[in-house]
Every structure is written in structure tokens, then in C-alpha cells.
Amino acid sequence: MSLRILTNIYLTKDEGGIKQMKVLLLFSSADIGGAERSLSRMALSNDDDAVSYQLSTFGSYGVWSEWVASAGGVPICFDKRVWKLLKYIFTEKPDAIYIIGFRLAVLLRVITPFISKSFLVQGVRWNPNSNSMLDKTFRFVEWLFGSLLDGYIVNSNSARLNLNKLVKKNIELIYNGIADIQPINSKKSDNKNIIITIANLSVRKGYEDYLRAIAIVVNKVPESRFLFLGKDNLDGKIQQLIIDNNLENSVQYLGFQEKIDEFLENSAVFVLPSLYGEGCPTSILEAFSFSLPVVAYQIDGIPELVTHGVDGLLFDVGDVNALADGIINLLLDPEKSTKMGISGYQKVKDYFLLNDMVKKHNDYFLRLK
């Protein structure tokens, strides 16, 4: 699919008397995670003249901006300067501001009405149902000030149900989508011992528990090899735990990788050990697109993607022994693993394509006009 190259200045078109809907897609972070990847791909893949997306970050030029530029986009960076952001909104007058980031959404819902008539839409890319301070604050603020937004877009039904308890606004459910579905890899059996995880290193991603499970797996399947891909937000803690648990020969941390296809192509099983705070993980859909079975905890939006025993294995959160047994089961039964991977592959083809994600976003924003 050809990419629409976006510029810093919106192109306003009147086709058939209909003015183009201009959407400022604004990320609070300059880093790149599942939300940044999936929504940026959505915006870059849009070819509907009725809607245009300007990609931007409240942060500075960095990993995400470079990634967008490499894909043909022209991102705007506001360098954490509120005045720069407000000046842009006042000058360019986007029809809608699609905000990804809770704190930034709070700020804009207070200030923006004084300078702009832009619709304010908050993207909630996780299920805010945990006891973390962030989630508690989120629930309180949305209950109190949710009326100042024009709407929400969530990417999991679990998030929609929880948000529905707090606000009366219309909440739109749009799952993530994948653009390129790879042909089924007939050589997966050659990579039967490689287990991959794509997730930034953070507390909620559950890497500490995962290392305990890995120690059990390695004891039963010594030839197994584990790959960790993602930005380190724990200042080397996980790398030190790998050393402390004598897992250096079994676990390799590769940091953030802009291109992940080759790693997925050469893996047999995908594991996402998140403990809480998931919506519709893009990494799971990417794993399915490469015919990988998924092993994860049964939390938040993950069961909406993974069907236990069909295209993956789901376990109670924190059950390290069960997580380890699930991985071992797939490593020792490659036929079962392959069958599950093919089921996941078919699920993505049927229900989680990027074109559908783009269309649903466009339809939503056009309804705001």
C-alpha cells in the first residue's frame, strides 16, 4: 500500500462541497511503543481524501520521529513546549485533536476550548482497571472531567466496559490492525526452540516473573533460546537479573529494534508476560501474522485476541509455573504449536487488518463534523 506523505501544513480540499476533516494525531511521548506504532501506521496508510492526519509528538525529535520519517511521514515535534502546541492549534485549526496520553489530554481539555473549536478525542490504549496510581488517577479524573472531551477511542472491549462506568460519552471501539500478512512459514520447524517477546522493559510488562518462568523452561528444555526486544525503561535491572540467574546463555536482550520481521520470522513461539495495563497489543497481532502461537496471561484485552487452546495459551496472571509449562508444552509439541500459529494467522487475516482500522477511524472522525 502506498503511504500518504503528510506535511506540516494541512492540505484543505473541497471535494463535492465537503471540507476535508483535519485530525492532529498527538502523542505525549517521543518514544515508540505499541500505540505509537499502530496509530502511526494507521495515519500513514490513510488514502481517504475526506480525512487527513498530521502525526505529532509533544516530545522532542527521537526514536518515534525517526521511525515515522523513515516510513515517509513528516512528524511535528513540540519539544514539550505548551506554547508551541497551542500556537499550532490556534494557527492551523485542526478539526479534531486525537490525543494519546492521559496527562496531555487533561491539559488540553482545560486550555483548548479558549483558543480552538477543535473536537477533543482521547485514545485510551490500555485497560485502566488496575490499582496502580496512574489508573486510579485516570478513573477519578475521567469520572470528574470526562464531559470536557468530545469522545474516546479504545482498542479493547475490556477498556470500553470499564470506561463506560465512568463517563456517559460515546466510546468507540477500534481494534488495532496489521498491514502486511506474511505467507505461512513452512520452515518454522527449523526455529522450534526460539521464543520471542516484543515489549518495552517496564514493571507492567512482567519481565521479572517471566525470568522465573524461563529458568523452569531452560531446566526442562536446555536448548531453548529467548529473545527480548524493546526499550529498557528499568535502567538495566532485567539485564542484571539475567546474569544473577545464570541465564546469559539462554536469554538475549536486543534492545529496541525498528525492524522486527526477521526476528519474528525466525522464532517459534511468542510470549507476552504483561501483568496489567494491556489493550489490544500490536505485538500479538504481529506474532499471529507470522504464524506464531501466543503465550500470555489472561488479562485485559488479551483474551479478545487470543483464544486459549486454539491460537495460543492463556494463564492466570502471576502463575509462573503455568506460564512455564505452557511454553514447554509448545516447544515439545511442534505440531500443536504450528497448528495454533496457523489459527492465529487466519484470525488476523479475517478480523485485524489495517485497512479496517483506518476506515473505522475515518468514519468516526467524519461523524464528529
Per-segment meaning from a language model:
Residues 25-83, 162-164, 173, 232-235:
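N-terminal strand-loop element at the rim of the active site
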Residues 265-279, 292:
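Acidic donor-binding loop of glycosyltransferase active sites
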Residues 308-309, 313-320, 329-334:
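Conserved acidic donor-binding segment of nucleotide-sugar-dependent glycosyltransferases
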Residues 158, 177:
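Carbohydrate-associated surface elements
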Residues 99-107, 124:
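Short His-centered aromatic/hydrophobic patch
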Residues 293-296, 306:
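Short hydrophobic beta-strand element within catalytic cores of glycosyltransferases
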Residues 33-44, 193, 200-216, 233-239, ...:
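A conserved mid-protein helix/loop that constitutes part of the nucleotide-sugar donor-binding site
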Residues 234-237, 248-257, 263, 313-314:
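Active-site donor-binding acidic/aromatic loop of nucleotide-activated sugar
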